[in-house]
From Swiss-Prot:
GO cellular component: cytosol
Start and end residues of each BRCT domain: 578-660
EC number(s) stated in the UniProt entry for this protein: 6.5.1.2
Classification via CDD domains: BRCT_DNA_ligase_like, LIGANc
Cofactors that this protein relies on: Mg(2+); Mn(2+)
Keywords: DNA damage, DNA repair, DNA replication, Ligase, Magnesium, Manganese, Metal-binding, NAD, Zinc
Gene: ligA
Active site: K114 (n6-amp-lysine intermediate)
Metal-binding among keywords: yes
Organism whose genome encodes this protein: Nitratiruptor sp. (strain SB155-2)
Protein name, UniProt field: DNA ligase
Length: 660
């Protein structure tokens, strides 16, 4: 409990440091529960002492009442648009114009990613965030200050005390975009066409609490008004990052066209692997004195350009719309497309989410549509181009029976479900999910193998996986001695799996990884015996989740007990046992090759109470290393962080009562 103002200030600084490590460095220093506990203590102190609240306290991010409309804010200096180039020839022509107007060729160019989101202008005064506004017309934008304060990667306070504008892009990560669209589709709400629209729409919410739920990030790309004297663009950005903003994954200084093109190709290759959308890279003349010499057109500066990637959105035609049955019985319509290449990948199918979405967008077979693809995000139809209709397009009927088993479906309006638990599609997809990486992670049990096992009658249920015999597998096409033995070994190796992984693998509707952990922490392996009123005691469990558990257990109780007998899942360690672990509350880092996969070791360490992070800092307690350790080993040596071999890690885990 915080007793006085000094302790309060120390707690606020600690929260700010932890939040910076989590949201900006992507390297959490403490577990969520430690952060949450101190956050609540700070909140309580602020309620008792409202006159002492630090405006940069993380608690001040959310709290503003919903606005009736957005006010206007005039930018201190103009927010310019940017010229685009789309290929090497156009880039060459832009460079030639720059060289000609600058009167010299010995120039350097500062390169940074072009994030695909919503532009935002932040004004800081006396070290505090004074306002945040959208680009608007470049002169005047909309006041979204309350919303910007909910974005954790935007500092509420900076070290610099002068008046300054810091500009950047608000983005949503690809996986969060996919989840957001999925949730909206389930609720019957319109989905966002792409991550850029999702970021812009989330930033322009009248209620800041809605913005806070959208998991937005802010990447700075320039300084507007300022009284500082920078000589180079890269110095400007170094200054910005020193104030606590996120650095991009890559930035560089190039000296000629060849280096710029090489970097462009590197950006293109890494684009799909990144958590956020890029639509190109920005090339700026690094020497700021040249900016005024090169000047501006009516629309954009002549000293910078966006070197754009090929589009991730393409036009194509829907050939057919077919229904697919998932593991929970939900029937999802999928568009079969005329093949179209997007970023080097041929796209032939795209999700349509649900039949309510088809009706809302009036999607028909034969329509010309816009399709988006981004990295791991499933290709999606975002827009119907009705101007291309000929009158031959066909409307899509909502299915009355399951397309796989032929049984009548339950039509809930937004969702349509097959309720037949023995439906082949439901069974196969349940087994695929059960064996998947995020569940039991049974090696060698992919989609093709599961379908083969089901078609040959060897597996009709997840329980059958643990009854497989090598002689049966050897009769299957593609199975030789080694492959058959590997699959048997893989199914047996999951014995002793953690309770929460077992629960998560069952595929109970609305019960994911987080809820599975909470269930097991509260009830252990007896989770399925817990009465309804006890389930409601778990934080975050509402009627929908409780009903899902009840309905699942009612139908599958015998199967749950059989699987517990076969798998012998491990009970979660009690809090007092974790406290006695030599690894309790230790921040650790792994480097090098070890005898088990990194994900498995991370789980074991977390069960022992450790917090596993991705990079080494002064706050790291141990770095455990295996064969061929990487740069983290050298970083630990430089910082004086204890380096322990893999064998020592296993000793500490054993001491904590954790067996591999």
């Amino acid at each position: 409990m915080i007793k006085n103002y000094q302790e309060y200030k120390e707690a606020v600084e600690k929260l700010k440091r932890w939040a910076y490590a989590y949201y900006v460095l992507d390297n959490p220093e403490v577990p969520d529960e430690v952060y949450d506990k101190l956050y609540r203590e700070v909140e309580e102190y602020e309620k008792a002492h409202p006159d002492q609240i630090d405006p940069t306290s993380p608690t001040q991010r959310i709290g503003a009442e919903p606005a009736k409309e957005f006010k206007k804010i005039k930018h201190l200096s103009k927010m310019w648009s940017m010229e685009d180039v789309f290929n090497q020839r156009e880039m060459h022509e832009w460079l030639e114009r720059v060289y000609k107007n600058a009167g010299r060729k010995d120039l350097q160019f500062y390169i940074e990613p072009k994030f695909d989101g919503a532009s935002l202008n932040l004004i800081y005064e006396n070290g505090l965030l004074k306002s945040a506004a959208t680009r608007g017309d470049g002169e005047v934008g909309e006041d979204v200050t309350a919303n910007a304060k909910t974005i954790p990667s935007i500092p509420l306070g900076i070290d610099y005390k002068g008046l300054i504008e810091i500009r950047g892009e608000v983005v949503i990560r690809k996986d969060d975009f996919e989840k957001l669209n999925h949730e909206r589709a389930l609720k019957g709400e319109s989905t966002f066409a792409n991550p850029r629209n999702a970021a812009a729409g989330s930033l322009r919410q009248l209620d800041p609490k809605v913005t806070a739920q959208r998991k937005l990030y802010f990447y700075p790309w320039d300084i507007g008004y300022n009284t500082l004297n920078f000589k180079y663009q890269h110095e400007k950005m170094d200054f910005v990052y020193q104030q606590g903003f996120i650095k991009p994954f890559k930035r560089a200084i190039c000296e000629n066209e060849e280096e710029i093109q090489q970097l462009y190709e590197e950006f293109s290759k890494e684009r799909d692997k990144l958590p956020v959308m890029l639509d190109g890279m920005v090339v700026k003349v690094d020497e700021i004195a040249l900016h005024e010499i090169l000047g501006y057109t009516v629309k954009y500066p002549r000293w910078m350009v966006a070197y754009k990637f090929p589009a991730v959105e393409k036009m194509t035609r829907i050939i057919d719309i077919v229904p697919q049955v998932g593991r929970t019985g939900v029937i999802t319509p999928v568009a079969i497309l005329e093949p179209v290449e997007i970023e080097g990948v041929v796209v032939e199918r795209a999700t349509l989410h649900n039949y309510a979405e088809i009706e809302r967008k009036d999607i028909r077979i034969g329509d010309m549509v816009i399709v988006i693809r981004s990295g791991d995000v499933i290709p999606e139809v975002t827009k119907v181009l009705t101007q291309y209709r000929t009158g031959k397009e066909k409307k899509v009927e909502r299915p009355k029976v399951c397309p796989v088993c032929g049984q009548p479906v339950l039509d809930e309006g937004i969702l349509i479900k097959c309720q037949n638990l023995s439906c082949p599609a439901r069974v196969v997809n349940s087994i695929i999910y059960f064996a998947s990486k995020q569940c039991l992670d049974i090696s060698g049990l992919g989609e093709a193998t599961v379908k083969l096992l089901y078609e040959k009658g060897l597996v009709k249920d997840v329980v059958d996986l643990f009854k497989l015999k090598k002689e049966d597998l050897l009769r299957l096409p593609g199975f030789a001695e080694k492959k058959a033995q590997n699959l048997i070994d893989a199914t047996q190796s999951v014995k002793g799996v953690e309770c929460w992984r077992f629960v998560n693998a069952l595929g109970i509707e609305h019960i994911g990884e987080v809820a599975s952990k909470k269930l097991c922490e509260k009830f252990g392996l007896d989770w399925y015996k817990a009465p309804k009123e006890k389930l409601y005691e778990i934080e975050g469990f509402g009627p929908e989740m409780v009903r899902s558990i009840e309905e699942f257990v009612e139908v599958n109780k015998e199967k749950i007990e059989k699987l517990i007998e076969l798998l012998q899942p491990t009970e979660p360690k009690k809090e007092e046992e974790v406290e006695n672990s030599p690894l309790a509350h230790k921040t650790v880092v792994l480097t090098g090759e070890m005898k088990l996969p990194r994900s498995k070791i991370k789980e074991l360490l977390e069960r022992a109470g450790a917090h596993v992070t991705n990079s080494v800092s002064h706050h790291t307690d141990y770095v455990f290393y295996g064969e061929n350790p990487g740069s983290k080993f050298q970083k630990a040596q430089q910082l004086g962080v204890p380096l322990l071999p893999e064998e020592k890690m296993w000793e500490l885990l054993k001491e904590a009562g954790i067996e591999a």
